[in-house]
Amino acid sequence: MSRAIHVFRTPDRFIAGTVGEPGDRSFYLQAVHETRVISVLLEKQQVQVLADRMGLLLEEVHRRFGTEVPPQGAQLDDVSPLVTPIDVEFRVGTMGLGWDADAESVVVELLAVSETEFDESVVLDDSEDGPDAVRVFLSPLQARDFSLRSERVIAAGRAPCPLCTEPLAPEGHICIRTNGYRRGQSFGLTQEQDEEE
């Protein structure tokens, strides 16, 4: 079977989004151009890394090339949900990020998880030997929007415990900082024994 490389040179949207309740969410990246939609599945940490690195790349591009980039506190333009139905093309394994100076674009490449070992030379390579890929070219504004939206999507999950910073679950939380006990409970005593003393 031949390799599929989905290229979006001028996407209408490139966004991160989720499906599911906090604590049980699936994370997706979606590239859209007119009626063409490609969705890929990935881990929350991958979204976080991509958003962080994209922000750092924009700062480096501005520093080295003088290219105008939107400020970090820019307002988010695209708050619409993912396009549905979500048909997953593949699960993301390797990710690549770069700057195309000629096009003044951030280049994002997402490679499918593969049973075959590949080195980083397959990133941005069009040869038939490699995993399926999605390659997206983003303007600095689109890249900043992606980064900002991704941060908001990640932050919309479960709130962190104020003591141990682990995510709080709706059914409760056993905090390692309190050795598994809840405040107000006496250790090793039933409520009746505690009231008698």
Annotate each language-model stretch with its function.
Residues 1-197:
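Positively charged, low-complexity terminal tracts
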